[in-house]
From Swiss-Prot:
<dbReference type="GO" id="GO:0042301">
    <property type="term" value="F:phosphate ion binding"/>
</dbReference>
<feature type="topological domain" description="Cytoplasmic">
    <location>
        <begin position="1"/>
        <end position="89"/>
    </location>
</feature>
<feature type="transmembrane region" description="Helical; Name=M6">
    <location>
        <begin position="486"/>
        <end position="506"/>
    </location>
</feature>
<feature type="transmembrane region" description="Helical; Name=M5">
    <location>
        <begin position="409"/>
        <end position="429"/>
    </location>
</feature>
<keyword id="KW-0406">Ion transport</keyword>
<keyword id="KW-0769">Symport</keyword>
<comment type="function">
    <text>Involved in actively transporting phosphate into cells via Na(+) cotransport.</text>
</comment>
<keyword id="KW-0812">Transmembrane</keyword>
<keyword id="KW-0813">Transport</keyword>
<keyword id="KW-1015">Disulfide bond</keyword>
<dbReference type="GO" id="GO:0006817">
    <property type="term" value="P:phosphate ion transport"/>
</dbReference>
<keyword id="KW-0472">Membrane</keyword>
<feature type="transmembrane region" description="Helical; Name=M7">
    <location>
        <begin position="526"/>
        <end position="546"/>
    </location>
</feature>
<feature type="transmembrane region" description="Helical; Name=M3">
    <location>
        <begin position="213"/>
        <end position="233"/>
    </location>
</feature>
<protein>
    <recommendedName>
        <fullName>Sodium-dependent phosphate transport protein 2B</fullName>
    </recommendedName>
</protein>
<dbReference type="GO" id="GO:0005903">
    <property type="term" value="C:brush border"/>
</dbReference>
<keyword id="KW-0739">Sodium transport</keyword>
């Protein structure tokens, strides 16, 4: 006897089952239900299993766990090209052209806002950054030099500016090359903050923010890990200084033409109408020139005339005269004739703040707020446009072109080709920050994967050094060697980092670390801001402050912290790969208090502290809020608290049940006491978790 006797003749036939027009199912056999009695006399109802009901019981569908790092499928929700008439096709073409033009316009203003943002940071903190270079005793400490490079680049938002200051100091013999190399390493770290700030603008959607923040911080982790390995190696061996000195001495470089300006030819006409800076003041402050301490960095006169003329001047004694024939005495004064150089102002600059008598800090604050607003607006609009354009076949082609590897056995070549593409694109835009910041929204919406963004970012690091090398070759003969050696140190530092963290897949730690940080930041979005403040401000400032006190104090404070970090890393590795070698208590982090091993208590604390700033709005305000959100297309999570609560109230999770459950036998069974499942308008079964299981 079969374990399921009802299934022996369970083939569906047209004679046994009919479906009426009104959707009810009726069984033709006379005894679909048989009532029996047990020993106690209680009636038992036997229900004959319908085939669709029985298959649901016997077949288990495998559940697939969704990988959050898989690229989303960008489906085309509009009409297909074949379904459009002639008028619709023409409108579609013009609409595509219009979107492409708008995309270029928003991208142009996005790049210009980055340039203005850099100028704003220089006005606000440029003089403070220049003073970091005054203390030569601190600069001799490699660790302090590295954090000075980070702080200066964060404050001026330009690694080119901080590098040019270092080159000027090396050329003036105020700073040796071996002390300048850690500053270059720190500048490489500081320049990666820009695209991390850009990634914060996509915090509205958790999935997009996970990808965007991971794609941005992969640059951070590469630079930090490279410095962690190469800075002690350079301090112990000086290999970068020796290698670059050998290259410079072996090849007889001559002064060349200035580095070509490609993107700046387009952006400078607009940004120079907003603000123009005299960046030579930063170099003079770094060289401890007291005459420019109170001088404004805002350029007032763009056209000047330098004239050399002979004038009668007084000198202390006849020995100071230019020649005996040009020396005479008039009473108590000795006079002579000397060549005097004076500068005559001819034409003022044409920018907004040229006639405003405002301090650098006020102008910098105004530009900082304005440029951040423009940056956020342009980024949001770029993401919306890309989201509407990159759909269907277009998205599939672009994603396949960017993320697909070459066929075996040449698949390994794809990553190195991506490095070359990243270097070439960065050479064109002449800024690694611009290239990586423009790539961040593409990572967020799922066009570029993290695995492909990593080599593109490494190429951007190489591309920005080639621009510096060309700029160094355009230097005058007195500074050619020093500036070229610094630029080559930057180049070989990035090459060494690529050798460490790219060729072998196992060593691509920046990808895994960035994914981990992306998972944490998408769940606790405030942690992204904490990461920026801690790694780019607090840690460098703490190291710099301890360096001011002295090297022994820095070692005494840092050693226990480094030891604890190493113990945590080793314990985490042992827990993951060989937990059997650990005591039972150390196989997990449960022995620690909950607030030390989880961010959930901190999240509750921060949520409670910030709840007073969340907007509570009335019914009328909710209508306005939803109208504004509908116009700008922003995500639901950026709406006010009351609107979000209204949207989440009574929200039932739609679970697509297997087809076997979506049958009329279940409805028949529901009439006998089982809760009937509700079906929404789209045909999706809205069921509870118990019913689905």
């Amino acid at each position: 006897m079969a374990p399921w006797p009802e299934l022996e003749n369970s083939q569906p036939t047209s004679e046994k089952y009919t479906v009426k027009a009104d959707g009810e199912q009726s069984a033709k056999p006379e005894k679909a239900k048989e009532t029996e009695k047990d020993d106690t006399g209680t009636p038992i109802t036997k229900i004959e299993l319908v085939p669709s009901h029985s298959t649901a019981t016997l077949i288990e569908e495998p559940t697939e766990v969704e990988d959050p790092w898989d690229l989303p499928e960008l489906k085309d929700t509009g009409l297909k090209w074949s379904e459009r008439d002639t008028k619709g096709k023409i409108l579609c073409v013009f609409q595509g052209i219009g979107k492409f033009i708008l995309l270029l316009v928003f991208l142009y203003f996005f790049v210009c806002s980055l340039d203005v943002l850099s100028s704003a940071f220089q006005l606000v903190g440029g003089k403070v950054a220049g003073k970091f270079f005054n203390n030569n005793s601190i600069m001799s400490n490699p660790l302090a030099g590295m954090v000075i490079g980070v702080l200066v680049t964060v404050l001026v938002q330009s690694s080119s500016t901080s590098t040019s200051i270092v080159v000027s100091m090396v050329a003036s013999s105020l700073l040796p090359v071996h002390a300048a190399i850690p500053i270059i390493m720190g500048a490489n770290i500081g320049t990666s903050i820009t695209n991390t700030i850009v990634a914060l603008m996509q915090a509205g959607d958790r999935k997009e923010f996970r990808r965007a923040f991971a794609g941005a911080t992969v640059h951070d982790f590469f630079n930090w890990l490279s410095v962690l390995v190469l800075l002690p190696l350079e301090a112990a061996t000086g290999y970068l200084e020796r290698l670059t000195n050998l290259v410079v001495e072996s090849f007889h470089f001559k002064n060349g033409e200035e580095a070509p300006e490609l993107l700046k030819v387009i952006t400078d006409p607009f940004t120079k109408l907003i603000i123009q800076l005299d960046k030579s003041i930063l170099n003079q402050i770094a060289m401890n020139d007291e005459s420019v301490q109170n001088k404004s960095m805002i350029k007032i006169w763009c056209k000047t005339f330098t004239n050399v003329t002979e004038r009668n001047v007084t000198v202390p004694s006849p020995e100071n005269c230019t020649s005996p024939s040009l020396c005479w005495t008039d009473g108590l004064y000795t006079w002579t004739i000397k060549n005097v150089t004076y500068k005559e102002n001819i034409a003022k600059c044409q920018h907004i703040f040229v006639n405003f008598n405002l301090s650098d800090a006020i102008v910098g604050t105004i530009l900082l707020i304005t440029s951040l607003l423009i940056l956020c607006t342009c980024l949001i609009l770029i993401v919306k446009l890309l989201g509407s354009v990159l759909r269907g076949q277009v998205a599939a082609v672009i994603k396949k072109t960017i993320n697909t590897d070459f066929p075996y056995p040449f698949s390994w070549v794809t990553g190195y080709l991506a490095i070359l593409v990243g270097a070439g694109m960065t050479f064109i835009v002449q800024s690694s920050s611009v290239f990586t910041s423009a790539m961040t929204p593409l990572i967020g919406i799922g066009v570029i994967s993290i695995q492909r963004a990593y080599p593109l970012t490494l190429g951007a690091n190489i591309g920005t050094t080639t621009t510096a090398i060309l700029a160094a070759l355009a230097s005058p003969g007195s500074t050619l060697k020093s500036s070229l050696q610094i630029a080559l140190c930057h180049f070989f530092f990035n090459i060494s980092g690529i050798i460490l963290w790219y060729p072998i897949p196992f060593t691509r730690l920046p990808i895994r670390l960035a994914k981990g940080l992306g998972n944490i930041s998408s769940k606790y979005r405030w942690f992204a801001i904490v990461y920026l403040i801690v790694f780019f401000l607090l840690i460098p400032l703490a190291v710099f402050g301890l360096s001011l006190i002295g090297w022994p104090v820095l070692v005494g404070v840092a050693s226990p912290i480094v030891l604890v970090i190493l113990l945590v890393v080793v314990l985490k590795i042992l827990q993951s790969f060989c937990p059997g070698s650990l005591p039972q208590k150390l196989r997990s982090w449960d022995f620690l208090p909950f607030w030390m091993r989880s961010l959930e208590p901190w999240d509750k604390l921060i949520t409670s502290l910030t709840s007073c700033f969340q907007m509570r709005c009335c019914c009328c305000c909710r209508v306005c809020c939803r109208l504004c959100c509908g116009l700008c297309g922003c995500s639901k999570c950026c709406r006010c608290t009351k609107c979000s609560e209204d949207l989440e109230e009574g929200k039932d999770e739609p679970v697509k049940s297997p087809e076997a459950f979506n049958n009329l036998a279940m409805d028949k069974e529901a009439q006998d006491g089982v809760t009937k499942s509700e079906v929404d308008a789209s045909g999706t079964k809205i069921v509870s978790s118990v019913t689905a299981l």
